[in-house]
UniProtKB/Swiss-Prot annotation:
Family per record: Belongs to the class I-like SAM-binding methyltransferase superfamily. RNA M5U methyltransferase family. RlmD subfamily.
Primary role: Catalyzes the formation of 5-methyl-uridine at position 1939 (m5U1939) in 23S rRNA.
Lineage, broadest ranks: Bacteria, Pseudomonadati, Pseudomonadota, Gammaproteobacteria, Enterobacterales
Active site: 389 (nucleophile)
BP terms from Gene Ontology: rRNA base methylation
CDD domains in UniProt: AdoMet_MTases
List of residues binding [4Fe-4S] cluster: 81, 87, 90, 162
Entry's EC annotation: 2.1.1.190
Listed PROSITE patterns: SAM_MT_RNA_M5U, TRAM, TRMA_1, TRMA_2
Keywords tagged on the record: 4Fe-4S, Iron, Iron-sulfur, Metal-binding, Methyltransferase, rRNA processing, S-adenosyl-L-methionine, Transferase
Designated name of the protein: 23S rRNA (uracil(1939)-C(5))-methyltransferase RlmD
Amino acid sequence: MAQFYSAKRRTTTRQIITVSVNDLDSFGQGVARHNGKTLFIPGLLPQENAEVAVTEDKKQYARAKVVRRLSDSPERETPRCPHFGVCGGCQQQHASVDLQQRSKSAALARLMKHDVSEVIADVPWGYRRRARLSLNYLPKTQQLQMGFRKAGSSDIVDVKQCPILAPQLEALLPKVRACLGSLQAMRHLGHVELVQATSGTLMILRHTAPLSSADREKLERFSHSEGLDLYLAPDSEILETVSGEMPWYDSNGLRLTFSPRDFIQVNAGVNQKMVARALEWLDVQPEDRVLDLFCGMGNFTLPLATQAASVVGVEGVPALVEKGQQNARLNGLQNVTFYHENLEEDVTKQPWAKNGFDKVLLDPARAGAAGVMQQIIKLEPIRIVYVSCNPATLARDSEALLKAGYTIARLAMLDMFPHTGHLESMVLFSRVK
């Protein structure tokens, strides 16, 4: 008779070692060296010693977790959020803001092989004007969870407060939770978004089943009592306006309207400074023709139009092109035009590009702009400002400009998301004469 044996699970004993941390990476992990190998340890800061357990051992590097911290860095801070360390939203509340900015700037400088000229920052707390909170009904307790995802998990952290949220939004958290937790449709809710616009506060509720008249009435009463613009989203395509007018925000003296689902920069303060610095770096003159690629609904395009002879905004999403045109009309700007184009194709052959451009600005998504770099080079602008939310693709795309005879004149780290691992940046390229 054949006999079958289950293979015994291999057990590994985690090695406990003592390390000294000498650096902080841009994601907020302490960096140490052990046996000639780089070791990444979340939760530790430079100048700290600790006993750590190795959790992952690769050929080039290893990861570890803290068993016992033996000393504290002078730049260690007490996290303001009670959910820090569990919630996946923030990774660096234990580090001083100055240390966070230095570590991100150093990472950017290494990637770009160029010194960081400046850090563009604003308030480090209460800066986030948009939040998307996951909702989950717990049948056992008949309670509604509302919060953000746990670090490295799809589980939800039931968030009671969030100090990086705009104060108006943080104050709403318990009230929104109580309202949604009283709905008959509590088990059919997907997420809720809160947005703080200049025009007021928005609440967008994603529900996966039709709402009863009683639930709709309850939501309307809540929105009126809290002064919210209320939107209901039964699916990803439909958005019903229950109350409120078209929202808008200020951008360098202009009023930009947007749909509740449109992308807007989360950090209003840094956005204002970023736009102002981009215009300054481009040195826009009254006779200039300026091209804005990946322009969205005109965050840079419209402020550029207040200084240049003419501005062309190019965007791949038709709805954003329409919104840009609408915003130009609302602000009385007649020297700006928006075009819907596939930026992977050669747009330099379009009629609007035949006269060339003196200056170019681009603000692509995380994938970068590899498909348009040669097109920009063909246009031969004097100055180029590249705004990036991914330093790796920025470094890759920059190579084409450097080979074409451009040099990096300025490099800024944008502290758009304090206390997180997100690193944004802006570069000025100048053509060598």
